[in-house]
Amino acid sequence: HRVYVEMRFTVRDCSSLPNVPGSCKETFNLYYYETDSNIDNKISTFWNESPYLKVDTIAADESFSQVDFGGRLMKVNTEVRSFGPLTRSGFYLAFQDYGACMSLLSVRVFFKKCPSVVQNFAVFPETMTGAESTSLVIARGTCIPNAEEVDVPIKLYCNGDGEWMVPIGKCTCKAGYEPENHVVCKACPAAMFKANQGMGICAQCPANSRSTSEASPICICRNGYYRADFDTPEAPCTSVPSGPRNVISIVNETAITLEWHPPRETGGRDDVNYNIICKKCQSDRRGCSHCDDNVDFVPRQLGLTDTRVFISNLWVHTPYTFEIQAVNGVTNKSPFPPQHVSVNITTNQAAPSSVPIMHQVKATMKSITLSWPQPEQPNGIILDYEIRYYEKDHHEFNSSLARSQTNTASIEGLRPGVVYVVQVRARTVAGYGKFSSKMCFQTLTEEDYKSELREQLPLIAGSAAAGVVFIVSLVAISIVCSRKRTYSKEAVYSDKLQHYSTGRGSPGMKIYIDPFTYEDPNEAVREFAKEIDVSFVKIEEVIGAGEFGEVYKGRLKLPSKREISVAIKTLKAGYSEKQRRDFLSEASIMGQFDHPNIIRLEGVVTKSRPVMIITEFMENGALDSFLRQNDGQFTVIQLVGMLRGIAAGMKYLSEMNYVHRDLAARNILVNSNLVCKVSDFGLSRYLQDDTSDPTYTSSLGGKIPVRWTAPEAIRYRKFTSASDVWSYGIVMWEVMSYGERPYWDMSNQDVINAIEQDYRLPPPMDCPAALHQLMLDCWQKDRNSRPRFGEIVNTLDKMIRNPASLKTVATIPAVPSQPLLDRSIPDISAFTSVDDWLSAIKMGQYRDNFLSSGFTSLHVVAQMTSEDLLRIGITLAGHQKKILNSIQSMRVQISQSPTSIA
């Protein structure tokens, strides 16, 4: 250590002393001597100067004279000297005077140290200074309770003056503790936490979490809430999402497009994605198993971020169940399986697979005869084969085509000695399959042909002789047989044919049979509809009334099958035989159809009362009312998906030569997955004269739904698939307008007159131009110019594959290419109240919203904004647009008219 000596003393100025000898001094010396024992022997040599070490000669800064002494003004000096380092237990100080007139007033001996201190949340002990005045002594610190070191070990330096300097490292409060006054780490109270070590303070527990003890580094999630592995402790606890909504499935042969709405509840997270679980089922949808690896999912099967997936390579005519799971970052933390929505579909017939191989049967100079096996997966009846061939040295673009009704073909008109590349593909009613792999075959050269001919000459001669003998024998036999032949009348067919080959149909295509062609209508019912024992049927509730009786929701439990929901049409008591025949004719019609977009007949009950027709149950009911209830809630792609399903069903019906005659949104049913199915195949309304329903108007002895019917069908009763296409165009308009009434409040006669004058419906609000153009195509006056349903399906498929084509919204040009009906905006001056105005624009359901919020006059209503509509409870986007458009027109009319408006 180093020792400091503070001396207070006075010195008299030598010049102020009279008769001062020359030995007068004004300084003295300071010495020290280290020892391990007391030295108090007067004769000891240690009292001599020699063992002492001189510290310094001490001189006074100020001295005093005799004058000062007389006035008692002593000038005291204070000097501090240090020495060291000391290595022994003690030391002696010595002051040597060489003749100075001085007084040593006091001596203070001390050493310097750095005091104990708390700095940077660490405690540093009392530390002695170093041996030299410039020395720095390192002091190691210890973190205070509930604090931890950060990075490097913490230390301070004690300098020669006893001051701390140069701090290195620090401690901070550990997780669960917060700093207080920079010297204490205080525990976080209950309901608060601190996740990390550092200077941060405690915070309230995030949403859906709690802490019940002090010093919590993390808050525990409440029941049903979780944190993902990558979530920080500061993040709120979240839950799993609810299931996806409003699934639309579009089946295209052995592929399907699925679309859906996101879950209503995301669990408080923004990382929702979707998994598709594919299950292939038996025909009764029992014994489902996971799909194999051959099924393709685009963009992928798991972790989808978009609400759309395209699935292909499915089996033909096979029931599938697809589960669309909604998952997020905490789904794997929940003990429960992900929420999902299921959709059941049945694939259609696909095109055949490729032909595996070809064989050369024969070759000549100008022809090649080939044969091949049937495709491994014909997926239907092979109608014919198409052969593509071209010279190997030429490009594929120069290929030629040939067709064969069998699996052999002779390609004629070839060049001698040339190698040809040949491919073949099969065709069914579903279309062409893929071409086979390329194979090469060569025609004979002239030399090869002559050589082969020489080898066959003996065989040809022998065959000719045998042929003459055979012909003579054959003539004799034919003479004998002709005498025994008798002609009989053609046998009468005992069974009705269910498959015809017509000029329009393809071989093997099932054709619709009109049940009214049966002499006994019961025969048609037995042939096309399955009889169900009434004990298997349970009626639950009335859901409507049909033309012949009430309609119920019920349950059907067939033996060895699961129970399903069904719709049950009943025939009211007191029916006539004609009414019974008409009632059951719909079942005879439905029973002939098997398509995912046609309502499915489960069976009939005819052996007990009441007579029943049992069909699959469609949860969302009729399409028109469903759209009105969900105005503005679907994307354009979802609406197009609905239209595509309806068109696919109608394509199926038209290919069976069935004409619907009453295609309208009210006759389309919607299930829980938003799959649309064509229904209502009863013909009785056309045979009666019931004026109770204004939708149907008498024409030429029958009932016609004028607003949906093609002009040739109204005028001439000419119903064809082309007239169904016209009706489909009206259905398109209904869908895009969310269930508005076609031609609004026009009378049926006004509608007929407008159509005859070539007026057509304008595009509904926000309707894509491409869809309105398709409507106009369906409404061509010349029925031969209208598209077929197959073309409509293809057009809609292209729109679905290219959503950008639907972004252009249709507008009515100043000079339209075709005159469009104008639903003129009502004259505001004709209204006397807000109630009248709302009724005129078909928004009367919001009357109480307006009046209870103070919007009681049209002048006040004219100033409303979209925010006002939200505030009074109008949340549907479609209704907001409709009301705002009318309000905007109201403002214009108010500004242009001086008429007083209520």
Curated annotation (Swiss-Prot):
Glycosylation site residues: 252, 344, 398
Domain of life the protein comes from: Eukaryota
Post-translational modification: Phosphorylated. Autophosphorylation is stimulated by ligands.
Signal sequence interval, chain numbering: none
Topology Extracellular: residue spans: 1-459
Residues spanning the membrane: 460-480
Domain Protein kinase: 537-800
Single Gene Ontology BP annotation: protein autophosphorylation
Location in the cell: Cell membrane; Early endosome membrane; Cell projection, Dendrite
Protein name: Ephrin type-B receptor 1-B
